Amino acid sequence: VDPNDPAFSKPSKPIGPVYTQAQADAVAKQRHWAMGPDGKGYRRLVASPKPVSIPALNAIRWLLAHGSLVIAAGGGGIPITRKPDGVGMQGVEAVIDKDLCSSLLAIELQADRLIIATDVAAVYLNWGQADARALVNTTPEELAGYAFATGSMAPKVAAACAFVRATGKRAVIGSLEQIEDMLAGHAGTQISPIAYQVAS
């Protein structure tokens, strides 16, 4: 990650145990942590910087080229920056968004498709409301005109759109249970540079 990413000045991702307000105030004072409400209590907030490179990319490429099934970018990976002297790396207290990291990995590997599997069938407009409707076939430009939930669907949409813009290839967001149909173009929200008709 970039040590100058503006996210470091605006911690937003809750991590760790849940505290009462009194406990959160004490921990914040003692450890100089940002704290914020989360559900029924308070949790530590850390930055969520944008991933800019994947140091293990060559190893991942080599493993793929030699027939390995590679599991990478789980949970977004471990955030690191270059040391101030430019030699070596150091860990930073942050959380990398798993969807943006997966998108970056797919772009760097020149993947044929990015599939973001989740627990809903598609990207919905007006999610949770009576007039909710699934987006079936869309483009990054169309999606830019809508607002999605910050902590759930927004990063998935941003990641899928980044992949489509960078590669000109298709991305899909939908249910893990429908992954084969998503790959075939029969399910999920299909995102491509130009809208197309979903295969029947």
Language-model regions, residue ranges each:
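C-terminal catalytic "cap/lid" subdomain
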Residues: 1-200
